């Protein structure tokens, strides 16, 4: 698994959580496989790509106001403060370069380019991180190390 010195932090393994993992944890009844998998990971290794924060906040922002939105917002806020605790892997120059190279390669191959997943891949590549996602096929051609916590 990936080890990293420097940003996003120290010399340790870095695990980035994709949007679908966070969404599964925000539900009334979080996916038990994801919870069990996450419980086996050192919390200090859990990071969130800044793009995932965007996706989650945007998704909540376009929801109709009501109790479901409030509950999901509270769930996200709890996860951000308790699980992630400020460990946000940002889109910096290196990760933007890696994402741009990947997007150009995909376009040249005629492969559809999903900008958000490409930015997440760039962050993962620049961080030499393991990406926890249900959508492994979105990242396989990028050379990103992935794990599917829904299957563990």
Per-region residue spans from a language model:
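Short, well-structured N-terminal submotif of metal-dependent ribonuclease cores
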Residues: 1-52, 61-78, 137, 141
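Active-site neighborhoods of divalent-metal-dependent phosphate/nucleic-acid chemistry enzymes
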Residues: 2-13, 58-64, 82-130, 134
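Structural detector of well-ordered beta-strand residues that form the stable sheet scaffold
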Residues: 47-49, 89, 132, 147
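Residues at the C-termini of beta-strands that transition into short coil/loop
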Residues: 50-52, 92, 135, 150
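Acidic-residue sensor for enzyme active/binding pockets
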Residues: 55
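Short, hinge-like loop/turn segments at secondary-structure boundaries
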Residues: 64-69, 106-107, 148-152
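Flexible glycine-rich beta->alpha loop in the catalytic core of nucleotide-sugar glycosyltransferases
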Residues: 130, 137, 152
């Amino acid at each position: 698994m990936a080890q990293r010195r420097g940003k996003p932090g120290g010399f340790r393994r870095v695990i980035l959580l994709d949007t679908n993992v966070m969404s599964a944890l925000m539900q009334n009844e979080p996916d038990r496989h994801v919870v069990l998998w996450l419980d086996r990971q050192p919390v200090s290794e859990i990071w969130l790509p800044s793009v995932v924060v965007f996706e989650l906040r945007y998704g909540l922002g376009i929801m109709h106001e009501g109790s479901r939105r409030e509950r999901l917002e509270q769930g996200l806020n709890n996860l951000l403060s308790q699980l992630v605790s400020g460990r946000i892997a940002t889109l910096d120059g290196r990760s933007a370069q890696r994402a741009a190279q990947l997007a150009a390669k995909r376009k040249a191959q005629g492969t559809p380019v999903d900008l958000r997943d490409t930015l997440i891949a760039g962050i993962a590549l620049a961080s030499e991180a393991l990406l926890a996602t249900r959508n492994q096929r979105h990242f396989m051609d990028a050379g990103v190390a992935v794990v599917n916590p829904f299957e563990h």
